[in-house]
Amino acid sequence: MQSDSNLRETLRSIDHKSYPAYKSLRGSYRFADYVLSIDHVQGDPFAAPSHVRVTVDAKAAAFPEYAMKNTRTRTALADELLRTFAAQINHFTFKAKGSGKSGLISVTHCGQEILTRTACEVNEKEITARFAVGFPANGRTINARELEKILFTYLPECVKYSFYYKNLDARRIRDAVELAEDQQAVRDQLKEQGLVAFVADDAVLPRESGISSRPMKQSVAFTSPESLRVTMQLPHRGAVTGMGIPKGITLIVGGGYHGKSTLLTALELGVYNHIAGDGREFVITDETALKLRSEDGRFIKDVDISMFINDLPNGKDTHHFSTEDASGSTSQAAGIVEGMEAGSRLFLLDEDTSATNFMVRDAFMQKVVSPDKEPITPFLSRARDLYEQAGISTILVAGSSGAFFHIADTVIQMDRYKPVDITKKAKALCKEFPISEEKPHPFALPHSHRIMEKDKNGATKRRDYRSGAVRKNEPERLKLKTMGTDGFAIGKQTVDLRYLEQLIDSEQTACLGMLLKYAVEHLVDGKRTIAEVVVQLQKELDTSGMRFLAENGIVSGGYAMPRVQEMYSCFNRYRV
């Protein structure tokens, strides 16, 4: 490994040369307090910035044992350090001058949720930060003096005040770690208390706006109905009270604009931990919860939707259903079956975004269209089977059909943003207004042995990133382009993820794209099932984190860990 003085000498030797001379800087350099690695150098000042990495020895960083003791605490610590580092480099970005992206210093900007990210990793041995730097130029001529400012003046100060415990706010570090431990304690107690979700008293559920996930100011704080109030004993905060939603079928009702969907949205994002001050720190949902909706036009491949749809007029086999252009009802049926395969124990649905004919059939419609002419068994007739025979609970927001009262174990009415337990009232009314129930065919767990296939359209030969020579005996390379949280292009096709409402960060999408790319290039062989491929990927993630997704030995700083449910959802939308 070279020294920082070697880097300074090289910089001065290439000053005023043509921009490609910057590539001679690739490598690692020992600074006094850390190792600086230049992993990738941009082709010109207008291209995507260069990839740079800083590695700090964990002993030198000297974080206390309570913050380093397990994966959970290290994730919370990494999140806090990354936010601090982002704030530090924000003071220096574009202070170095030049053309194009010259002087840019950027790193992942975290949202309200705490995610495992490659931008900052903490383990027992070291702390690693990955970020981007726009190497300065005048036109396309190297301006090494400006890069020297970044690497020898600005960056050392950012590292000093971001990754060394003695220079940080000890209270903030402790608070972040203790919050993570308290949040995990709630997750553990959900199972112990027979709950699928918990919403703490005084939680703030509404968000600032449709484009901001910050808490709304002057909003109505959440208050649990007494009949649903439970107490969580937390290791640091002690007793915390709030509304516990029990296993089974829960119905959320209420007038328009009274907070039904706001509560459901908070619950669907309760699969993630939130930062202090978010208002949803203790809105905690079963981590396998899956938000479902209809998706007209989605791709479905070999899914057993027979528990919901049978005897199609075209004679199509619904035990192995495939389509390039699903209807609202078939897409939602497939989503439920795929969610079961992904191990979800809780389904979240909103009547507003569901296919009406999939959810319910009223008595009048049953009279007009007899059951033998209707291939769809509505969700209303299957929700109880899903819970009693498959152990899957449901939380459903409804605003138009009263039929759902008849299957609900718990009914919560949102009244001016406050929840009211009206279960007893609803059950009494059900006796006064009975409904005609269709007798569905016997429930059977769906068949699930779907082989994963691959599409090599758009694949290119792998080349050595230094010489450009084709690499022999290596799998072809699929090009990948991420489009925010909407999806990604892989090869010549697009994977549409717009309706995965629990996919919250573009870096999760980027990671999903890389996971699919890795699977297609290394795991998919025409024999493995989707489940087997996901299990193998999960083993890799558990063993080495997202580092195994490195390309040309370079780990991107732009990945965030998705849940296994989103992995399944992504792979199920891969059109092959």
Task: Identify what each model region corresponds to.
Residues 298, 308-329, 360-376:
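Flexible beta-alpha connector loops of hexameric P-loop NTPases
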Residues 388-391, 397-576:
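Conserved NTP phosphate-binding and transfer environment spanning the P-loop NTPase/kinase superfamily
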Residues 240-272:
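Glycine-rich phosphate-binding P-loop
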Residues 206-241, 276, 284-289, 293-300, ...:
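N-terminal pre-Walker A segment at the start of P-loop NTPase domains
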Residues 340-383, 387-388, 397-428:
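Conserved P-loop NTPase nucleotide-binding/switch module
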Residues 1-185, 189-194, 205:
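N-terminal accessory targeting/assembly segments
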Residues 164-220, 290-291, 297, 316-320, ...:
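Long, charge-dense accessory insertions within large macromolecular proteins
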Residues 320-354:
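Phosphate-binding/switch loop-helix module in NTP-utilizing enzymes
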